[in-house]
Amino acid sequence: MGILVAILMAGWAGTQLVSFTPGPAQVTAAASSAPAAKIGTADLDALLAKIIVADQVDQSALDEIESQGKPVITAAAYYAAARFEHAHKRYDSALRYSRRALELAPKQAALHAWYAMLLVDSGQYPDAVAEAEQAAQIEPNSADVQRILGLAYYNAGRLPPAIEAWKHSLQLKSDAEVSRDLAKAEREASVEVNFTETENGRFTLRYEGGKPAQTLLRDDVFRTLDRQYDVLTHDLGSAPSGPVTVIIYSEQQFFDVTQAPSWVGALNDGKMRIPLGNVVSMTPQTEAVLRHELTHSFVHAIVPHCPLWLNEGLAQLEEPKSSLAFSQDVLQRLRSRQAPPLRELEKSFAGLNSDQAHLAYAQSLLAAEYLRSAYGMDGLRRMLMALATGMEPEDALRSVTGGGYDELDKSVSAFLSNRSL
């Protein structure tokens, strides 16, 4: 379920990376892989066969089922439609069909739990908590419901009830993923027990307060984030639906909570986790990290399944960062076929060694730079919007450039070659 995105802090290999790794805070994969719940006596497979035509939900078929006056069966049909749309990355329609299912069968815990998962995935955390609590009231001893309740609480920044829900879930059913999420939440709660929390509408900032220098740094962090929030809203045409959580750690606290590799310099798992060590005032490097990590939060709000190279490329553009320092190294690797094609950089970089990771992130930045130079920020924005409709990455790329990955690889190489002349 995790993906790894990094920011090249300076130069080429041997530098520190900033990571983006969805944990319990982002449940797209969990929603996609969750087994279909039983809704009354409905046969979901049979309903799905009725409502899907040419790989699309047929609204007239749903209307026909609804006209038969059987609310629970109709709710099951809308639930089946929601799962189908979510599997095809059409998230807005998945939410819409889920809402209709709940209107028809409000006492079905499975429908509340499923809707809560979708709301977490779309960043609507307070609403997700409300739906998950409804599910838990109806079926308090369901391990799956308690798991989702924990996810909702965790994302809403409510660690104690999240821990309680996950413990309850594990008492009902052993689950390795829930155990992992619980352990992470307990580490986080232990480290942050004396943290101060401050909000400004757009951000919830948690930090170890109590010193004047930390208050000054807090104000600098808010100013930097607020400026970049406006920039990203303009550049990407959208913004997260709720406050973004930002947690400032010491170096040791950061690694205690995240258990990240030693080369990781910051992390976004739905919460921006920033280790500032002994920093007491804003530096250019810290500003770049904050801008980078906030970009990941914006991209995830638009399209949870963004190809990793695009996600990382955009984040580096927004720092802002240039590839000039290492473009010749990348060009040599491309010419000697020591660099992977971009189609192989859609998923997690977590299994790469440090040198491979730096190369992958450099390629991501170069691809984004080329697309911006050829199609403008509008082209990158249109690609995100195409992905948000459920398009596959290569189809979204074609919708902007007219070509697929093979053409993009060639164009990036030509872009680098022309730069070297």
Model-derived features with residue positions:
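Register position in tetratricopeptide repeats
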Residues: A87-H88, D121-S122, N155-A156, E188
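TPR alpha-solenoid repeat register
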Residues: A77, L111, V145, V178-S179
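Canonical positions in the second alpha-helix
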Residues: I65-Q68, R100-A101, Q134-A135, H168-S169
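Active-site-proximal alpha-helical
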Residues: L232, A339-D406, S417
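Short coil turns that delineate tetratricopeptide repeat
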Residues: V72, P106, P140, K173-S174, ...
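Juxtacatalytic substrate-recognition/specificity segment
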Residues: N194-P307, E318-A325, R333-A339, E346-A350, ...
